[in-house]
Curated annotation (Swiss-Prot):
Gene Ontology terms describing biological process: animal organ development; growth hormone receptor signaling pathway; positive regulation of growth; positive regulation of receptor signaling pathway via JAK-STAT; response to nutrient levels
Alphabetized PROSITE patterns for the sequence: SOMATOTROPIN_1 (PS00266), SOMATOTROPIN_2 (PS00338)
Gene: gh
Disulfide bond positions: 75-179, 196-204
Transmembrane parts of this sequence: none
Protein name, UniProt field: Somatotropin
Organism the protein comes from: Protopterus annectens
GO cellular component: extracellular space
Length: 206
């Protein structure tokens, strides 16, 4: 009889162990996705702040007008099949949205590895790596093979230049910051679309 009384406790212990990995509880899909959205939002806001600060301090009205109408304003991500807005994103599967997001994040890892004056945020690179890892975990959780072979972004961006006395370097940094802001906005949008689709009850805003 003592063995029978012990059995429910043993069963509960075994069930709990199945929900852990290396002694730590595995986060729920909702938590993983919420963390990814928070990191994407942080990077998007950071990129927007740095872009506006840089524009105010280094870019004249004439330069601003000329660069927005030049090939320098082109972002690599515009050559990918990634959705261009939330309505387009809603037509994609969750796995596609994760893969698009991961490709955009990875395109910026090298440029942000060595940060110069134009960006000036030492935690940006770490946040980018955290988000990359978070997206990879989400993809493993949802892996179904449906998105294999999807053509994604193949380029990475140039590194930021620390030379603020060269007009060429200044315009290059301005263009890079503009692209970084656009790409982080895309990543945040994709992840919010995915979160709202899977967990509509969880403070869902896009």
């Amino acid at each position: 009889m003592a063995g029978l009384h012990f059995f429910p406790a043993l069963l509960a212990l075994l069930m709990a162990s199945l929900q852990t990995h290396q002694g730590f509880p595995m986060p729920s899909l909702s938590s993983l996705l919420s963390n990814a959205v928070q990191r994407a939002n942080y990077l998007h806001n950071l990129a927007g702040d740095r872009y506006r600060d840089f524009e105010q301090n280094y870019i004249s009205d004439e330069q601003r007008h000329s660069i927005k109408n030049s090939p320098a304003a082109y972002c690599y991500s515009e050559s990918s099949p990634a959705p261009t807005g939330k309505e387009d994103a809603r037509q994609k599967s969750d796995m596609d949205l994760l893969r698009f997001s991961l490709s955009l994040i990875q395109a910026w890892i090298s440029p942000l590895q060595i940060l110069g004056r134009p960006f000036g945020s030492p935690d940006a690179y770490d946040k980018l790596l955290d988000l990359e890892k978070g997206l990879q975990v989400l993809m493993r959780e949802l892996e179904d093979g449906s998105s294999r072979g999807l053509s994604l972004l193949k380029h990475t961006y140039d590194k930021f230049s620390a030379n603020q006395f060269s007009e060429e370097a200044t315009l290059k940094n301005y263009s890079l910051l503009a692209c970084f802001k656009k790409d982080m906005h895309k990543v945040e949008t994709y992840l919010r679309v995915m979160k709202c689709r899977r967990f509509p009850e969880s403070n869902c805003t896009i």
